[in-house]
Structure formats: C-alpha cells, structure tokens
Amino acid sequence: MTVINDSAVATELTELYLKYEKALCTNDVETLDNLFWDAPEVVRFGVRENLYGSDDVRAFRKGRSPVNVDREMFNLKVVTFDADTAAVTLEFRRAIDGVVRLGRQSQMWRKFPQGWKIVSAHVSFLPV
C-alpha cells in the first residue's frame, strides 16, 4: 500500500525545496545543478524553453541572468508517495520589467541512492 504524505518525508522534501528556492533566487548554479537529476531523461519546461537532459538544464542555468531572479512564493504544496517519490507545486509573484507577474511551478522528485533529485520541472506564467 502506498503511503501518502508521510510527515517525515514531507518535511524532508519541504526543506529541500526551500533550499532549491533559495538557490534559484540567489542564482546559486552549483546547488541548482546538484538538485537536478544528472541524466539524459531529466526534463525542464521553462517560460521560453524546453530542456531535455541534464546538459541542457546546466547550460540554461549557466546562461541565465542573475539580475532580478527573486520572487515571492505562495501555495507551496508537497505530496509524497512512499519514501522515494514526491510532487512539489507552488505559485509565485515576480516583477518583470516593472510588471508583477503570477506564475506557477511543478516538480517531480525521486530519491536515488545519492539523494533526492528533481526529475521533471515545469515553470510558467499566467497571462497578463
């Protein structure tokens, strides 16, 4: 039987996600790279890009401008499935060119022998 939202696993994933969020908002590329699965199967759908494989994700991170990357996060939801799979979703506000935009993000996480890794991610903005 699948255990949904074991409190210890959900707490662990929430802490890891907050580490990801801090790295994202401070452009800590090394931490971001370490949190993504290093595999050709990893996928990240961004606002303007579709990235397939860890090489694409790494290249995107390294080329991303470190200016104005902070955002206000809300409605963070972590749902765990047993001790090795989780979905993380949230909404955020971010100012782009003086306009506050509402966005959303979803990630699938999987626990490997080397720890938890993001295996799939999606980021998008709602229409203005």
PLM region spans:
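A solvent-exposed, acidic/Ser-Thr-rich amphipathic alpha-helical stretch
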Residues: 10, 29-82, 97-100
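Short beta-strand edge/turn micro-motifs at domain boundaries
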Residues: 102-128
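Short, solvent-exposed coil/turn segments at beta-strand boundaries
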Residues: 81-84, 112-114
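Short, low-complexity N-terminal intrinsically disordered segments enriched in polar/charged residues
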Residues: 1-35, 128
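Short beta-strand segments enriched in hydrophobic/aromatic residues
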Residues: 36-37, 92-94, 122-125
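A short hydrophobic beta-strand element
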Residues: 82-92
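Beta-strand elements of well-folded, non-transmembrane domains
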Residues: 94-96, 109
